[in-house]
Amino acid sequence: MEENMEEGQTQKGCFECCIKCLGGIPYASLIATILLYAGVALFCGCGHEALSGTVNILQTYFEMARTAGDTLDVFTMIDIFKYVIYGIAAAFFVYGILLMVEGFFTTGAIKDLYGDFKITTCGRCVSAWFIMLTYLFMLAWLGVTAFTSLPVYMYFNLWTICRNTTLVEGANLCLDLRQFGIVTIGEEKKICTVSENFLRMCESTELNMTFHLFIVALAGAGAAVIAMVHYLMVLSANWAYVKDACRMQKYEDIKSKEEQELHDIHSTRSKERLNAYT
């Protein structure tokens, strides 16, 4: 009988501990972090592969070659974009962890309204700092989303030309890379529907795959923007709650101080009356 009671108390204690741990998880920050990681993974992974596919398409079907020396050509720009993608993946992996840690600490400060005042003050300052940083990152991701839409538009035009040549017999359509700024005005890198390279490019799966990879990368950038907006809402709410916690703590300190002063005054008066009677 006693063993059953001890076992029940142990199970109850474990259940209460699990409930307490689950209650301390910042679910809003967790959802935003998952969305951020998913968006960054889609953008970085698909964007990297789409850039590699673009290099193959330019070299195979447009017959472009890398410029010797330190000349800044389209292939050098693509390599730079790949390094930027590596940096974005690493930076936002760390930033997501920092925001989750901030969410845990701020949630603990909010739940303990009567805790140490230094904890809530630190949480308030950290929340304000992350709000500013997240807002800047949101603007940056908006720019990345707008920039990613450019290759999607270019590949959509190319895909449309391929589709129109199959629907309209005898159509002679051309695509000049100079109109997209990929090559200089002096270079003529034009491919027309009557050429063999164009037909092979339209029949290959590489064009279709690269086009859809850029679309998924654009969707990933949009998901990162949504995650940044979600983080802004979470951080703003946490900052407001921590600010209220600070005010509550100040009020409690002033209230306890006044009560102590009143108690001291009453004690002093009681002693004076007692001395007067004696």
UniProtKB/Swiss-Prot annotation:
GO molecular function: calcium channel activity
Main location: membrane
Subcellular location: Cell membrane; Cell projection, Axon; Cell projection, Growth cone; Cell projection, Dendritic spine
Extracellular side: 44-84, 149-213
One protein family per Pfam: Myelin_PLP
Record GO biological process: neural retina development; neuron migration; neuron projection development; neuron projection morphogenesis; positive regulation of filopodium assembly; regulation of synapse organization; response to bacterium; stem cell differentiation
Glycan attachment sites: 164, 208
Transmembrane regions: 23-43, 85-105, 128-148, 214-234
Record topology, Cytoplasmic segments: 1-22, 106-127, 235-278
Domain of life: Eukaryota
GO CC annotations, alphabetized: axonal growth cone; dendritic spine; extracellular exosome; extracellular vesicle; filopodium; glutamatergic synapse; neuron projection; neuronal cell body
Keywords: Acetylation, Cell membrane, Cell projection, Disulfide bond, Glycoprotein, Lipoprotein, Membrane, Neurogenesis, Palmitate, Phosphoprotein, Synapse, Transmembrane, Transmembrane helix
Modified residues (Phosphoserine): 256
Disulfide bonds, paired cysteine numbers: 174-192
SMART domains attached to this UniProt entry: PLP
Keyword match Cytoplasm: no
UniProt key word Lipoprotein: yes
UniProt modified residues of type Phosphothreonine: 278
Family, as annotated: Belongs to the myelin proteolipid protein family.
Function noted in UniProt: Involved in neuronal differentiation, including differentiation and migration of neuronal stem cells. Plays a role in neuronal plasticity and is involved in neurite and filopodia outgrowth, filopodia motility and probably synapse formation. GPM6A-induced filopodia formation involves mitogen-activated protein kinase (MAPK) and Src signaling pathways. May be involved in neuronal NGF-dependent Ca(2+) influx. May be involved in regulation of endocytosis and intracellular trafficking of G-protein-coupled receptors (GPCRs); enhances internalization and recycling of mu-type opioid receptor.
Subunit structure: Interacts with OPRM1. Interacts with palmitoyltransferase ZDHHC17/HIP14; the interaction leads to palmitoylation of GPM6A.
PANTHER family: MYELIN PROTEOLIPID, NEURONAL MEMBRANE GLYCOPROTEIN M6-A
Protein name per Swiss-Prot or TrEMBL: Neuronal membrane glycoprotein M6-a
Gene name of the encoded protein: GPM6A
